[in-house]
């Protein structure tokens, strides 16, 4: 692609040595990935400033550079822009030929429920005869090929590459607040956008819950001409978003328990795998929700309303739900020889953990046991509220480690001790090794116990633990098949 085509729609200051016909063979924002013929985009990142690596990029073969800082005297053309992140995303879209235009694009955002809603959508859409790609937290799935995810919302180059590679009719994207704030979805427009809910999360990144909401709501400004918004009204932030979009040209539909919702939940007939009664238009029908818990009632309703707007009847979609097999790392249940139930779940917010407890209570759990870990360099402000919640509900709370992310282990253990003393009245057990914490709960489990292991879901461990496993699920499977007690 020639330079002027790549810069189309991007405001830059063009240098004297600008060549509109300069052929660009690739784009990179990592100087180490540059090959001759590439353009380098210098981004002021969170851990390093890309402008420091311009010389390295040129040495590796970059033939042009885009950045924010005023820089002179380079041997290649340098284009200054006000926002190099936005420029990167727009150039990526230009480079790959605006691939979002060839797909029906569905964006899913919210604190909780993005992944489950995306998997539900993919299943229903594919069972209805359409092909579907997915970009999200667990995996990226393109043309039926599974690619392990690095982030919920990938960087702009990866997103546009995946969209260009996809031959599927529909693409579902989980859209994180980080992805929106960091301009990763710039240049992408959606046919459908879904808002699941909002809760206290990522407040180490966003200055307040209001700022977090405002970032999330920016997804709904990225709609195609006849775009449709699907909003959960049972959450106060969903109602605020509905009000915010009232004067927009797009169609806005809600699901919840209000009489004015497009899809209204009338009642829940059973609890664990809920059978629900739903009103849509003038008709009502019973629907079997394929996943446990009230939170999955809302996830299912959001998926059903979206596919209905795509032309798939609620009756047909509900029929397809019967063959849904679940989501990796989302409320995956495992039986214990003594009759206990172990659950691996990604839950890492108060709301998500409360949903887990509600399900256990509805199933008459005799005891709730929780193995809870926190990650280094993550939102520490929410930890005290989560520990307080867990200690109030659980018969046994075990505090353990999640990913350290460069924080010294001793410092994280001290943090667990402090949380235990201040917000759990010293009642929690502290077992830093995550696998040994799970083994401890496994060895002590009794009939009627519900044991939750939260925070990582399907994710692999980033450091080594005592047991020879790499995920929470593998740890449980190891303990189920171990013929002899595992040494401490």
Predicted regions and their residues:
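N-terminal leader/targeting and accessory segments in enzymes
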Residues: 1-90, 236, 264-267, 286, ...
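ATP-dependent carboxylate-amine ligase
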Residues: 1-12, 36-39, 305-315, 319-326, ...
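Phosphate-binding loop of NTP-binding sites
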Residues: 9-10, 88-233, 237-250, 301-304, ...
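Receiver (REC) domain switch/active-site residues of two-component response regulators
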Residues: 63, 191, 395
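Short secondary-structure boundary segments
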Residues: 67-70, 175, 197, 233, ...
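Acidic, Mg2+-coordinating active-site environments of NTP-dependent enzymes
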Residues: 71-75, 192-342, 417-424
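Structural beta-sheet core signal
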Residues: 134, 173, 193, 231, ...
């Amino acid at each position: 692609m020639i330079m002027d085509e790549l810069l189309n729609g991007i405001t830059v200051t063009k240098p004297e040595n600008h060549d509109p016909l300069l052929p660009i063979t690739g784009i990179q924002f990592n100087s180490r990935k540059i090959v001759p013929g590439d353009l380098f985009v210098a981004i002021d990142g969170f851990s390093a400033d890309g402008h420091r690596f311009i010389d390295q990029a040129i040495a590796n073969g970059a033939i042009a550079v885009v950045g924010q800082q005023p820089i002179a005297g380079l041997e290649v053309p340098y284009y200054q822009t006000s926002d190099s992140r936005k420029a990167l995303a727009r150039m990526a879209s230009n480079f790959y030929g605006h691939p979002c235009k060839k797909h029906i694009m569905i964006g899913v955002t919210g604190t909780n429920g993005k992944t489950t809603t995306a998997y539900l959508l993919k299943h229903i859409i594919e069972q209805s005869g359409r092909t579907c790609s997915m970009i999200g937290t667990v995996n990226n799935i393109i043309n039926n090929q599974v690619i392990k995810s690095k982030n919920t919302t990938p960087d702009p180059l990866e997103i546009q590459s995946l969209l260009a590679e996809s031959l599927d009719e529909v693409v579902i994207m989980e859209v994180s607040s980080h992805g929106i704030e960091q301009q990763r979805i710039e240049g992408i427009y959606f046919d459908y956008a879904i808002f699941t809910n909002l809760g206290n999360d990522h407040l180490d990144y966003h200055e307040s819950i209001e700022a977090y909401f405002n970032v999330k709501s920016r997804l709904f400004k990225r709609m195609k001409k006849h775009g449709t918004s699907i909003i959960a009204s049972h959450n106060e932030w969903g109602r605020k978003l509905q009000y915010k979009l009232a004067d927009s040209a797009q169609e806005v539909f809600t699901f919840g328990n209000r009489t004015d919702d497009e899809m209204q939940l009338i009642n829940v007939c059973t609890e664990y795998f809920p059978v629900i009664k739903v009103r849509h238009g003038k008709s009502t029908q019973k629907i079997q929700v394929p996943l446990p818990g009230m939170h999955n009632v809302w996830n299912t309703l959001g998926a059903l309303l979206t596919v209905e707007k795509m032309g798939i009847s609620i009756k047909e979609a509900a029929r397809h739900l019967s063959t849904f097999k679940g989501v990796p790392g989302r409320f995956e249940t495992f039986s214990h020889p003594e009759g206990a139930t172990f659950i691996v779940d990604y839950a890492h917010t108060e709301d998500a953990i409360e949903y887990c407890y509600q399900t256990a209570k509805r199933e008459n759990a005799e005891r709730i046991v929780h193995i809870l870990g926190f990650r280094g360099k993550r939102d520490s402000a929410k930890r005290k509220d989560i520990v307080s919640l867990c200690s109030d509900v659980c018969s046994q709370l075990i505090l353990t480690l999640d990913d350290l992310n460069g924080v010294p282990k001793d410092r994280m253990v001290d943090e667990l001790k402090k949380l235990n003393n201040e917000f759990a009245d010293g009642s929690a057990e502290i077992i830093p090794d995550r696998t040994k914490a799970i083994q401890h709960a496994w060895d002590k489990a009794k009939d009627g116990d519900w044991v939750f292991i939260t925070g990582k879901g399907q994710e692999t461990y980033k450091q080594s633990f005592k047991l020879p496993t790499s995920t929470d699920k593998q740890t449980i499977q190891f303990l189920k098949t171990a013929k002899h007690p595992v040494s401490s």
